[in-house]
């Protein structure tokens, strides 16, 4: 379920959440629950306690989305470098940077969102999707000059990593000292980098 929330909240457009999704509410498969006035449609807010881990994950994902305007831009993504800054607003990758694998059997995808295409200048964001049943190593695209990649979210563990302040992330870094040129992504999980 963390994967679903990560995909939803890292997508462009308005996230469509139904009341209770944030704590795993279910209507037991009933997609016509509008005509029920019983426990199928009632929300049991006690689940916010019993499902605290997913509830907290959703809260933190919403906060992450709010912090990064590149995740909720007003313009549609073009996959072109329309600003002439060296990277497109969005690019698609496979386990190798800049080499997307759209074959039928591929279960891995990387998406790079150019931070300078946000409403205000933002961090670049790279999202590594591994829907395969084994661990996979993802080669990360070169970060913007003077920056390096930091893992921010890992759906396998549900962990949100503490990031250094933006000032420290922008300092000059020698290319050979860049952190995370490759990253091992656990099976059926997503890792978000900034």
Where do the language-model regions lie?
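Carbohydrate-interacting/catalytic domains
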Residues: 2, 6-17, 21-194
